[in-house]
Curated annotation (Swiss-Prot):
CDD domains membership: HFD_Aq328-like_rpt2
Alphabetical list of SUPFAM superfamilies matching this protein: Histone-fold (SSF47113)
Record InterPro entries: DUF1931 (IPR015207), Histone-fold (IPR009072)
Pfam families registered for this protein in UniProt: DUF1931
Any GO MF annotation of the entry: protein heterodimerization activity
Origin: domain of life: Bacteria
Protein family membership: To A.aeolicus aq_328.
Protein name: Uncharacterized protein aq_616
Organism taxonomic ancestry: Bacteria, Pseudomonadati, Aquificota, Aquificia, Aquificales
Length: 167
């Protein structure tokens, strides 16, 4: 089964405060006063997750399975490092609101996944870690591209493309 586009809603209900606090305290990047940037960032995170899931579906089909395993997803070493960082920082106050947001996002993804092959339990359990890792990776790459504390709108598409090549 090859999907052109996963049926996941693009506009995520992420408040600017979640991303703003995460970016400022984790990598020192300021996105204050720009709600549209938060929406672009959350859309990018979901797009990257969709790409991973799409490739995971292809790998599961290639291996003759009718379910998708966590190990079917092409998790790179870089993404795994950011996932581990997210897991370690999950208890910190800066990430609590973001983890709560990820729980809401997971509900949205589960609704969309009804049209997909079933996902194994480990993949369900690691979904928030994957999304959080992608978000931290986005923040880190954006900081390197911008070079200072402010996130510029024109750097978001560049960051998106860099992430696509890294993952």
């Amino acid at each position: 089964m090859r999907l052109k586009k996963l049926p996941i809603r693009r506009k995520m209900p992420m408040e600017l405060a979640y991303i703003e606090k995460l970016f400022r305290e984790e990598v020192g990047l300021d996105i204050k006063e720009h709600k549209d940037k938060a929406e672009q960032i959350s859309e990018t995170v979901v797009e990257i997750y969709e790409e991973l899931l799409r490739k995971g579906i292809e790998n599961a089909n290639y291996n003759g399975r009718d379910y998708v395993s966590y190990y079917d997803l092409p998790i790179t070493e870089d993404l795994e490092r950011y996932m581990n960082r997210f897991i370690q920082d999950r208890g910190e106050e800066v990430l609590k609101a973001f983890v709560d947001y990820l729980a809401k996002l997971e509900e949205e993804l589960l609704k969309a996944e009804e049209a997909l092959p079933p996902l194994d339990e480990e993949l369900h359990q690691k979904k928030a870690d994957i999304l959080g890792g992608i978000m931290l990776m986005f923040a880190s790459v954006a900081k390197q591209i911008n070079g200072d504390r402010k996130l510029y709108a024109e750097s978001i598409p560049v960051t998106r493309e860099v992430l696509r090549t890294m993952i």
